[in-house]
Amino acid sequence: GLDSKGFEGGIISSVVPPLTTVLEKMCEKYLGFKPILVGPGIKSGIKIKYDNPKEVGADRIVNAVAAYHKYGGPVIIVDFGTATTFDAITADFDYLGGAIAPGIHISSEALFKRAARLYRVEIAKPERIIGKNTAESMKSGIYFGYIGLVENIVDKMKEEMGGGRIFTVATGGLAPLICSGTKKIDAVDLMLTLDGLKLIYDKNKN
């Protein structure tokens, strides 16, 4: 294990306030430092153009910072989490906003729970789009339907951003699976959020 006295500091990005408090107290009690919290007032360098900047989730800001520093701008970030978020960043490091859609797990769970004769299936890339049985048909609808959602939102965001070359990066646990079925994503970066946390930590630690 690691020596608890060996940590110089830490940073927390959380969209669950009760958990944020628990993590903050844990760091102070067991690790000996007060963590930096990603939220209003944090130095990130990004200019947030949302109607109410406080509404932007900490994870979206962290991803935006990492994507801009790693890939430049303009850039679109697609994060496959509990919800799937789409975020638009300009060449001048402005956070324009984005879109929030139900995550693929939430969508599939709704299908299982609302349709009495349907059952849970593995979320996987089907061999074909035309299913030959109920399980195959559900896998096809879930997988290819979700790819359609992603591609359409990315295309429309690019249009609103003025077109041209706009890099698109995806992150989140299901990014490799979903992005294997589309050419609209330029890179899958599973370290994006952690890289963003490090960048923001370095900017605020002093």
Whereabouts are the PLM-identified features?
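Acidic, glycine-rich active-site loops and adjacent beta-strand->loop/helix elements
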Residues: 42, 83-84
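Short beta-strand scaffold segments in enzyme catalytic cores
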Residues: 77, 84-89
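Short, surface-exposed recognition loops or helix-turn segments adjacent to catalytic cores
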Residues: 80-83, 126
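Nucleotide/phosphate-binding catalytic cleft detector across ATP-hydrolyzing
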Residues: 1-76, 91-206
